[in-house]
């Protein structure tokens, strides 16, 4: 998945541009309820090119007192991890020394960079925009993120730089019947230790210093006749940076790994608990409808007081309640205790993720579900009616339900249907998707 990062000085309009690009293309991101909207990355599609767009401001916080340092860090991060850079400057303030410095850094990159000058909403700003040619750039895109001016020219050109044909299908074929698994989690949570344990030999360097593993490599293993590909086994860190920065950086890599996975193992630290970043990754897993297992590592070091354990688990379920389908496992990658449960669980989750249900069974379940709890009235006082349903896809199991007023279905009724389908089809450990369609008339008679 191509990652496009928006970079620029504070207050130039990065977030506004991010919102415009992601909002105008919300088809792909909006069809899943209950996922947090408060975030700085989005999967969008422009001219049929899917990509992930990231507002880097979110990675460095709002501490403007140290903004030069922060901005530099942000640029380096984006240069490292993104595929395309989108530089934004502010025509209202005009050319700023910081812009020149950033442009300099970007010019040294081998990645495509698009330079936009924002806040072009009047003739005065247009004059200011000309100043930016002093940066020695071939092409500058005058835009107004707030009003939409110039956005399509910019995005059309940017999308042309995104490679055709996502590698997804090729990769799918290549991996045959293998289950693609990624192990994600913040630095020091024990990813390398776990991978080494699974591989049965210390192939990945483990160290108590965060960020000691480098290159992205996939590892193949066969257990009990099932092949697994551990994606990006080297993990999601960088050498020689502070822990705090590392945690901010890792999200881009994490998102890319989610894209490539069937099943994501989200590792948490039993001692440190759940962080916002864990929830961010979890939100993305949900949004991308990937199967997931929550692995609580370092269980050997956890406080075994039953009350605390209960509080930990309650808190976990509460914070991951949008991901109820993810089984939770506790283990210790260090001692190996209970790690043996992981791959069988991955296999079971994957089985459900690929499950097919015949149309007859789907419709029987639909009938029973409706009989048990009638659909509420649609807004226009007409009765909401479901006609029939059928499974249209796997990974995840996806069901299309034909009804008279798809737009009138309340979220709570959708949740009810989802839960009943899960129960009826034994799909408790996989995401499933329900799509509501207006009934299509066939044949052209009557
Ligand atoms: N006039 C005008 N104002 C804009 C435009 N785009 C953004 N702004 C304003 O510029 C200000 C900063 O916008 P943000 O999108 O928050 O900028 P940012 O670069 O994300 O800022 P940081 O998060 O501080 O780095 C806001 O008050 C926006 O309303 C535009 O096209 N025209
Ligand atoms: N007590 C305990 N320590 C563990 C366990 N798993 C890993 N550790 C320790 O945690 C530290 C970090 O482990 P790593 O496997 O390097 O963690 P990582 O997630 O790969 O870390 P980064 O390279 O920073 O991303 C090491 O000192 C491990 O020995 C566990 O199950 N129990």
UniProtKB/Swiss-Prot annotation:
UniProt entry tagged with the keyword Iron: no
Keyword annotations: GTP-binding, Nucleotide-binding, Repeat, Ribosome biogenesis
Superkingdom as given in the UniProt entry: Bacteria
Residues holding GTP 1: 8-15, 55-59, 118-121
Binding site for GTP 2: 185-192, 232-236, 297-300
Domain KH-like: 355-440
One function term, GO molecular function aspect: ribosome binding
GO biological process per UniProt: ribosome biogenesis
A Pfam cross-reference name: MMR_HSR1
All copies of domain EngA-type G, residue ranges: 2-166, 179-354
Subunit: Associates with the 50S ribosomal subunit.
Purpose of the protein: GTPase that plays an essential role in the late steps of ribosome biogenesis.
HAMAP family: GTPase_Der (MF_00195)
NCBIfam families reported for this sequence: GTPase_EngA, small_GTP
Family to which the UniProt record says this protein belongs: Belongs to the TRAFAC class TrmE-Era-EngA-EngB-Septin-like GTPase superfamily. EngA (Der) GTPase family.
PANTHER family for the chain: GTPASE DER
Protein name: GTPase Der
Species this chain originates from: Syntrophobacter fumaroxidans (strain DSM 10017 / MPOB)
